[in-house]
Amino acid sequence: MALGRAFSVAVRGLDGEIVEIEADITSGLPGVHLVGLPDAALQESRDRVRAAVTNCGNSWPMARLTLALSPATLPKMGSVYDIALAAAVLSAQQKKPWERLENTLLLGELSLDGRVRPVRGVLPAVLAAKRDGWPAVVVPADNLPEASLVDGIDVRGVRTLGQLQSWLRGSTGLAGRITTADTTPESAADLADVVGQSQARFAVEVAAAGAHHLMLTVPPGVGKTMLAQRLPGLLPSLSGSESLEVTAIHSVAGLLSGDTPLITRPPFVAPHHSSSVAALVGGGSGMARPGAVSRAHRGVLFLDECAEISLSALEALRTPLEDGEIRLARRDGVACYPARFQLVLAANPCPCAPADPQDCICAAATKRRYLGKLSGPLLDRVDLRVQMHRLRAGAFSAADGESTSQVRQRVALAREAAAQRWRPHGFRTNAEVSGPLLRRKFRPSSAAMLPLRTALDRGLLSIRGVDRTLRVAWSLADLAGRTSPGIDEVAAALSFRQTGARR
């Protein structure tokens, strides 16, 4: 009997778990038996591994071969285990085990000729290896820039199975850590490109300062998409931990760029209005993959033509909006992805959507039904609502508005003021602050609260609406350089909440 052993990583969501792979060669009829809850792609690895091993000049054991992946109760999915399976088989045929194999995690898919192909989810796998104290990890050479983002662990890139064998024997080396640029190219979109729309521009600035959700109700062609695309440019760059978290999500989704693997700027995700629930919040067969809400984590999720999106997809947004994460239950377990994003909704005021509102042919009931798809609980979570109007000819002769860099400076100062205020309480932005904290310890003066009390008495606001209005008021105060909101900030925040879409 001969036994070989190698190690790999199973990724579920953004978490990784170490998988031990054992290859046992015993007397009996030749055959390969794979155990440990493998999926279809992993079952097919038997043929890939056998062809790769023999095509690299090695012999395949002419006996009964059992490949066991532990823990046995953990579902194993994908082709990431190929090179670990091959290494375990080759180790079982050696008279002396490879020492490096006991201290190295192996990730990668094999082609039939022994080339190592790139796989998804390398970054969360390497992070899991570092967390569990592994000294080294070998990844496909094409994934090496991504793996090199993790410090404190030895990462190596391999191109062929033969190259891996030579390294395990100690006869040759493998490519080491790659230093890549740590910046994402700045977007060429500038806020100065937007003509007119001063109220909507200011709403975007307030949204950036406090991380608030925003809704734009506007006729077609007025500039709602331009405004939404320029919101990420006003947001601060991601911190080191945020960059790794966002990059890990895009790694699992298979969307990383080989040139700039580290995402340092807030992402902008704009799914089509016909997207399904699974495309929006995540899902799919086998391992649940991140949806648009997770890909927009720490960035902006733009839903254009939101009144055309299915009701089930819209209602699925309520949980990530409230919790900042999405949990996807599948037969084999639950995958959890972070989903803390800024939501920007955009809708036409009616189905016919004429350029001039006077040309509208929709009945009043039709208009109510059109925007009525946006439920009260969903709209209640949107802090800023703006009704945009078509431009007049004079708007094109007016002076250009402020640029993105100018507005970004004010946003940065406002965010810094908010961060210093909320840091002792565990918050960073105004939109994250809990309602009880706002109402008890940071309650504005009695005079400043007058507009809110009036709206609450008239039934125009819910308690959650009061909390969200106070958050916007704090953002307005931060932009104005005030230490607390006054009656003007509270009234302005309330006006942002009471304009826009009407249900």
Curated annotation (Swiss-Prot):
SUPFAM superfamilies: P-loop containing nucleoside triphosphate hydrolases (SSF52540), Ribosomal protein S5 domain 2-like (SSF54211). Belongs to the Mg-chelatase subunits D/I family. ComM subfamily. GO terms for molecular function: ATP binding; ATP hydrolysis activity. InterPro entries: AAA+_ATPase (IPR003593), CHLI-like (IPR045006), Mg_chelat-rel (IPR004482), Mg_chelat-rel_C (IPR025158), Mg_chelatse_chII-like_cat_dom (IPR000523), P-loop_NTPase (IPR027417), Ribosomal_Su5_D2-typ_SF (IPR020568), Ribsml_uS5_D2-typ_fold_subgr (IPR014721). This is Uncharacterized protein MT2965. It holds the Pfam family Mg_chelatase_C. It comes from Mycobacterium tuberculosis (strain CDC 1551 / Oshkosh). CDD domains: AAA.
